[in-house]
């Protein structure tokens, strides 16, 4: 019976590898912020964004000011946030007010600035557990799941991306993820950017040197 167990293990491993390959970035072509998941014109029907506090929130909101008509106008939007100040800034955003519907989803910070290693590990575990529940509910509430998820900034965005990919793997339905690196990163990627780089469908940088250094990065000029 040992041979049967080996065959079953090989079959399961092959199936898992095929599924992971099918969901790998680039298999379905580049994500287009203004497109629908099935082609056609107009904004995607379901969008999820993340407001990561402070300057990260400011950059995301400026991005929406410029590209909101293509991205969120008329769409259903889920807004993840880690502090109430970011949520309030989102509520004041003209771009988000143009959405068909907006729901704000509180998320825990993966790491507080200045936290020690032990505290950072504990906060990351708590944030990961809470983010899984939030991401799963977002996919369920949006029926077919977010067609585009736009992320930037701190570690919580990486946690969100991780759970999206886990759920993609389980459901064999890929969520398009666009990660926008901060304007402040001129010569190297942030830690969050380095972690997100292999898993984002579109990895956008705002300086040409970064686009030359990282093969999958795309540069469209300064977006914010």
From Swiss-Prot:
Q: Which purpose does this protein serve, as stated in its record?
A: Involved in protein N-glycosylation. Essential for the second step of the dolichol-linked oligosaccharide pathway. Anchors the catalytic subunit ALG13 to the ER.
Subunit and partners: Heterodimer with ALG13 to form a functional enzyme.
Q: Where in the cell is it found?
A: Endoplasmic reticulum membrane; Nucleus membrane
The UniProt entry lists membrane topology as:
Single-pass membrane protein
Family membership: Belongs to the ALG14 family.
Keyword Transmembrane in annotation: yes
What's this protein's name? Answer: UDP-N-acetylglucosamine transferase subunit ALG14
